[in-house]
Amino acid sequence: MAHILIQNHPILTFEDEPFIDKYWNAGLSEFIISKHGYITTYDHNEVEEILLSCFEYFVDQFRTLILQQDTEIFFHYVFLLHEASIDLYIEQLKGLQLPDDIDSDFPRYCRILKLILEQSCDIELTAKRSIGYQKALNIMQELYYLGNWIYEFSIYTAYHKMIPSAYFVEFEENVFTCRWQNNYGELNKLLLKYFSIDYETFFDEAALDELKQAIEDNFFIDYKKAIGQIPIIKKHFSNRQNQTIEPYVLPINLAAECNTSEDNTWLFYSGLMITKANKLSIEDTVLKPHSEKRYIFRPMLTYIVDDVERSLVGDNKVAESMMVIASNTIHWNTMPEEWLQNKGMVKFMNKKGLEHDRLLENEIEKIFITNKFPYCRNTKSFKQKNGKSNVKVDIQGLGEIDFIVVNKDRKKIFISDTKYNRARYDAVGYRTDYTNFGGYEMKIEAKKNWLSKNLQVLQEHLEVMFHIDYGILDFEVEAIFFINTPTFYMFNGKYKAITLTRIKEYVEGSWDYPTIKLKDDSNKQFLYYTHPYFSKAPTATAFE
């Protein structure tokens, strides 16, 4: 079952069996033996080196196979599968439930199709030779297998860099194996499932419309005409989804249509193109998932066919890319680098970059107001009684405090920094956050230590601002992070990170990070993991 239809949309299923002997039992195993020896090791550094070698092996196999594909029609077959994947995603948003085995693989399947398509930009293609669909299908299936293991080992490596001694490696009957240590795989799986609901959070709904308006204002174009001419030109030649166009005509036509310069229109379109000049290597595509030089952000796949530059643009791909740019780049001061040559677009990006923390903070503030928690927001100084000067904290070594919130009943004060992070869905992205939080920890710790020693300052501030009639000098101070979307730091950070959906319950004390119970059959005991889950040894009780 390699190729099926779901609501008339074709999709590949992941298949191990045709390739496991070639690429794993023989290929990878022999490669690791030749490079590292016939080894069993639990040593963290040795395991990391071997995981990186596995990643390298599958990248090389993927690259070798794809560089052999020099027919344009092969990449058109992949393109049509990718178009179908976008259609299926749209159906999912409307409520379509994919079969469980398809649903779990679907996000990675879409990434691998994009990875394959991006490589076409590196290859001198020809339309003068063809390839049969079944043969192309077999190659696509093989690339899907290889791409899956590229992503898998990138994830293994990322987790291993975040968790001390996450994995061990060994050989079983001359076949290489890699496994989690300490039940971490099952633990991580349960945590991801438990916190999956936390992805259902708010986003900047106005960002897409604002982006389109900024494009019109700064490139002096009509956005609908800019995008609308692409299907018109395609249909002039044929009604095929995979009809290509010559990209040079787009800025010329739009400049004439909008009475603006071709410099403006060329900058706009070049920011939407992925080409040989700007595409990433296979390694960087996988390890830098938020780079703007990827097909997810650049919908115009541009390559050379028989010495002519052509662009392949999907019917729904521009809309997908614009949504991703609006939701997952501009708030983090990123956009297509060509657009950064336009001062107005830079100004727009900087404005959105300054807004994103405020958007999250506004939502958090609503929670505190609704639940009548005394709180301070964006505090740079504390008001004092009896005419005393304010106490400043926006100084070197401390800095503005995003939130302080008080729960009288629990005799607890929470001091928090707010982090509006990109949405992350695998360990490669999580690791970026994990590294960043190392710096955030030092800052929030300094603020917590200061506040713990200066509760009288906060006491007077709250009396002035909220007229509280109770003392807080014996309250416990807890440092936490408020975040918009789940990330691995939540599970293993020094300080707890609370998503928007759980802030109310955490502050009021009705929810906390759960204890995870796992069964250890080999030692006939139950293991109990608590936060931080991957840093503390679990407690154990024997089977009854």
Where are these regions (language model features)?
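Short helix-loop-beta junction
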Residues: 365-375
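A structural signal for isolated positions on well-ordered beta-strands in alpha/beta enzyme cores
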Residues: 402, 414, 478-480
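Active-site metal-binding core of divalent-cation-utilizing nuclease and nuclease-like domains
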Residues: 377-401, 405-410
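Catalytic cores of nucleic-acid endonucleases
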Residues: 420-482
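Short, solvent-exposed loop/turn segments at secondary-structure junctions
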Residues: 382-384, 421, 485-488
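A short, highly charged nucleic-acid-interacting micro-segment common to nuclease
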Residues: 342-364, 433-439
